[in-house]
């Protein structure tokens, strides 16, 4: 029997506000445990939550970016459950009236085709605290710094049909929230987390199979691996006559397997009811229009523009628009170079990205600025510097040795473009290698590269390669 995979993702994006969703406590990551929780976050008696207006604006911004409906009226609800790091005994969330409904995101498939993934809803909620199991010798410590941190939960339709599609959707959403500057997307710090609902069904069957929810998916790679394992587990179970149980499963990163965590809860298990301490959220058209004015150029729009305006291949445009910082860096560098977009793209993708990856830096932390990269491109274009020399200059700039012109002068890398000087080197290379000359003229054309190498070696790598090729061709073929 052939099986079809059905996947829906629930993404929790931590909103990039300075203070929490219902209190004035800070949201900075990495502080000492329990130093950033106020009485509201701790659920102490006599205090009331006050909604952070910036959280609402961020949700609207996201909704507009995915072409969703912004609800004119949404309501907060209490989601009741017990957990040690949930001090109030309930989580303030949104249930039947979320702030964002509908919407979609287009992803690219492995074959280059595009697929539209529906977004069911996006709602606002507060995060819980964090249970710490290490270093407590059989006990559990609770850190409530994270309690009350604003989250937006983005729920997709069950439109994803493979683990690869799920990873592509997650990456696309990750790029979008960073472009919108509503979430920093730091997965190591838990700012962007994913739960996946997955089931399988016979191909052609309309009814969904029994689903399992997967937790602990904090990287794109883990999402794909966990889903691959779970799909295979469910198919093996069904084909051996067993039944899939609706449950929550945890992905074990070390073993590469999912294991049962608890029976999957239904909505009625949480006894949702409207939050009595918060008024409904009213969003008028004026606020939506105000937020719309702040929308940046979105990733898909920017990628298309890079292809059209700069003449870049689709792959290059995709790499350069992967993050807003990357795209801005590229455009500033192109402007500084005098408009040489393709060479700028090549240097950025080959040299800059390699050095960033090697040193574990974000592009905003690069010691080579857009202006420096643009000037380096300009020196290659005006033939002051060879393409090979550009790599040496980049390495020196990365090491903090100065601007391109300064490095070129200091290291003596200025390219030789004087025709008579290059011609003398060409004549010398031919005269010093009569045997190779005879073989070349006898039809061994691969020796052309040998002569190019001899000239470049004699010039210390400074001779203009194009001129070397032209003069050699003329003299070897014409003499």
UniProtKB/Swiss-Prot annotation:
Enzymatic reactions: L-glutamyl-tRNA(Gln) + L-glutamine + ATP + H2O = L-glutaminyl-tRNA(Gln) + L-glutamate + ADP + phosphate + H(+); L-aspartyl-tRNA(Asn) + L-glutamine + ATP + H2O = L-asparaginyl-tRNA(Asn) + L-glutamate + ADP + phosphate + 2 H(+)
Pfam families named among the record's database cross-references: GatB_N, GatB_Yqey
GO BP annotation list: glutaminyl-tRNAGln biosynthesis via transamidation; translation
PANTHER family linked: GLUTAMYL-TRNA GLN AMIDOTRANSFERASE SUBUNIT B MITOCHONDRIAL AND PROKARYOTIC PET112-RELATED (PTHR11659), GLUTAMYL-TRNA(GLN) AMIDOTRANSFERASE SUBUNIT B, MITOCHONDRIAL (PTHR11659:SF0)
Entry's family note: Belongs to the GatB/GatE family. GatB subfamily.
Gene for this chain: gatB
UniProt-recorded name of the protein: Aspartyl/glutamyl-tRNA(Asn/Gln) amidotransferase subunit B
Record EC number: 6.3.5.-
Transmembrane segments: none
Self-association state and partner proteins as the record states: Heterotrimer of A, B and C subunits.
Record's keyword annotation contains Nucleotide-binding: yes
Keyword annotations from UniProtKB, A to Z: ATP-binding, Ligase, Nucleotide-binding, Protein biosynthesis
Function: Allows the formation of correctly charged Asn-tRNA(Asn) or Gln-tRNA(Gln) through the transamidation of misacylated Asp-tRNA(Asn) or Glu-tRNA(Gln) in organisms which lack either or both of asparaginyl-tRNA or glutaminyl-tRNA synthetases. The reaction takes place in the presence of glutamine and ATP through an activated phospho-Asp-tRNA(Asn) or phospho-Glu-tRNA(Gln).
Source domain of life: Bacteria
InterPro entries, alphabetized: Asn/Gln-tRNA_amidoTrfase_suB/E, Asn/Gln-tRNA_Trfase_suB/E_cat, Asn/Gln_amidotransferase, Asn/Gln_tRNA_amidoTrase-B-like, GatB, GatB_C_1, GatB_Yqey_C_2, Gln-tRNA_amidoTrfase_suB_CS
Single GO term (MF): glutaminyl-tRNA synthase (glutamine-hydrolyzing) activity
């Amino acid at each position: 029997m052939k099986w079809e995979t059905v996947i829906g993702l629930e993404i929790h994006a931590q909103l990039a506000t300075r203070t929490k969703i219902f209190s004035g406590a800070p949201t900075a990551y990495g502080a000492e445990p329990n130093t950033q929780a106020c009485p509201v976050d701790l659920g102490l008696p006599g205090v009331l939550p006050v909604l952070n207006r910036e959280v609402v604006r961020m949700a609207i911004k996201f909704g507009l970016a995915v072409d969703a409906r912004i609800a004119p009226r949404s309501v907060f609800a209490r989601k009741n459950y017990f957990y040690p790091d949930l001090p109030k005994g309930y989580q303030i969330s949104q249930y039947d009236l979320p702030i964002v409904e509908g919407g979609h995101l287009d992803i690219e498939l492995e074959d280059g085709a595009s697929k539209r993934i529906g977004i069911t809803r996006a709602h606002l909620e507060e995060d819980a605290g964090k249970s710490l199991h290490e270093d407590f010798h059989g006990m559990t410590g609770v850190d409530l710094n994270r309690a009350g941190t604003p989250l937006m939960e983005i729920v997709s339709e069950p439109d994803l049909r493979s683990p690869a599609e799920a990873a592509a959707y997650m990456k696309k959403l990750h790029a979008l929230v960073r472009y919108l500057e509503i979430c920093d997307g730091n997965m190591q710090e838990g700012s962007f987390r994913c739960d996946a609902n997955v089931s399988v069904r016979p191909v052609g069957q309309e009814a969904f199979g029994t689903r399992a929810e997967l937790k602990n998916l904090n990287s794109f790679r883990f999402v794909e691996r966990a889903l691959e394992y779970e799909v295979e587990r469910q198919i093996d179970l069904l084909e051996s006559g067993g039944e899939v149980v609706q449950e929550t499963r945890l992905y074990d990163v070390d073993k590469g397997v999912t294991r049962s965590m608890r029976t999957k809860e239904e909505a009625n298990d949480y006894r949702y009811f409207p939050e009595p301490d918060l008024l409904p959220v009213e969003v008028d058209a004026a606020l939506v229009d105000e937020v719309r004015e702040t929308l940046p150029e979105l990733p898909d729009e920017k990628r298309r523009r890079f292809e059209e305006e700069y003449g870049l291949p689709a792959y290059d445009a995709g790499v350069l628009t992967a993050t807003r910082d990357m795209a801005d860096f590229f455009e500033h560098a192109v402007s500084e170079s005098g408009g040489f977009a393709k060479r700028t793209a090549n240097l950025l993708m080959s040299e800059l990205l390699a050095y960033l990856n090697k040193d574990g830096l974000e592009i905003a932390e690069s010691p080579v600025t857009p202006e420096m990269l643009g000037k380096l491109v300009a020196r290659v274009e005006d033939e002051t510097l060879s393409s090979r020399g550009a790599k040496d200059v980049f390495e020196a700039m990365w090491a903090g040795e100065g601007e391109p012109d300064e490095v070129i002068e200091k290291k003596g890398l200025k390219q030789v473009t004087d025709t008579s000087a290059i011609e003398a080197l060409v004549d010398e290379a031919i005269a010093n290698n009569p045997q190779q000359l005879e073989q070349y003229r006898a039809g061994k054309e691969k020796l052309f590269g040998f002569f190019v190498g001899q000239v470049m070696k004699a010039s210390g790598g400074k001779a203009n390669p194009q001129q070397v090729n032209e003069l050699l061709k003329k003299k070897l073929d014409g003499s």
